[in-house]
């Protein structure tokens, strides 16, 4: 079936990362996966959660949210509802796990990196774009800590990025947009490190079960897309601050 912009099944949407997008944050980016746009910030907080006091290590946590008009129809703010949705909590925990997987928390010292990922326009893949962009924001926050001599060693061990893949009408597709995601038979989110280690695989058969062979096809397709995303991250980090 034809895709938007005539993309091939294994073709990513155009991806762009703009660093230093928010003036006050130690690290920040605007990331675009096609028409999906997310602002990711990294804030340095000079304390750790109570369960880590005196442990000699730091922490990283994440929050995720969507602007009310990031979607086709206005959503009510979760603050107005008085609680976060299960989806929001699931996504922000995923972002935190993904970034902690490549971070040496002992080298961070007793401080917290607070990640905030705010979707300003949604067209599928908001959680995967958040992870990919948040890594670059984290990298810049760590650069800040090193420049200020607050840490002596780089705690980042590897890159991390994420991409979606799915099966729509029997066809495996990489980097699903909203229409593809809402209509697909199978939906998979894959988080991987730059050394190609799997951090997380979230997979669901929405309408039709998928085989082990189809799973392997999707994972291979995701890995191909993730290698492109690592290149985008590296090129963004090579730009002059």
From Swiss-Prot:
Its EC number is 2.7.7.56. One of its GO terms (molecular function) is 3'-5'-RNA exonuclease activity. It comes from the Bacteria. It catalyses: tRNA(n+1) + phosphate = tRNA(n) + a ribonucleoside 5'-diphosphate. One of its GO terms (biological process) is rRNA catabolic process. InterPro entries: ExoRNase_PH_dom1, ExoRNase_PH_dom2, ExoRNase_PH_dom2_sf, PNPase/RNase_PH_dom_sf, Ribosomal_Su5_D2-typ_SF, RNase_PH, RNase_PH_bac-type, RNase_PH_CS. Phosphate binds at residues 87, 125-127. Keywords: Nucleotidyltransferase, RNA-binding, rRNA processing, Transferase, tRNA processing, tRNA-binding. It holds the Pfam family RNase_PH. The keyword rRNA processing applies. Homohexameric ring arranged as a trimer of dimers. Phosphorolytic 3'-5' exoribonuclease that plays an important role in tRNA 3'-end maturation. Removes nucleotide residues following the 3'-CCA terminus of tRNAs; can also add nucleotides to the ends of RNA molecules by using nucleoside diphosphates as substrates, but this may not be physiologically important. Probably plays a role in initiation of 16S rRNA degradation (leading to ribosome degradation) during starvation. Belongs to the RNase PH family. PANTHER family: EXOSOME COMPLEX COMPONENT, EXOSOME COMPLEX COMPONENT RRP41. This is Ribonuclease PH. It comes from Nitrosomonas europaea (strain ATCC 19718 / CIP 103999 / KCTC 2705 / NBRC 14298). The lineage of its organism: Bacteria, Pseudomonadati, Pseudomonadota, Betaproteobacteria, Nitrosomonadales. The gene is rph.
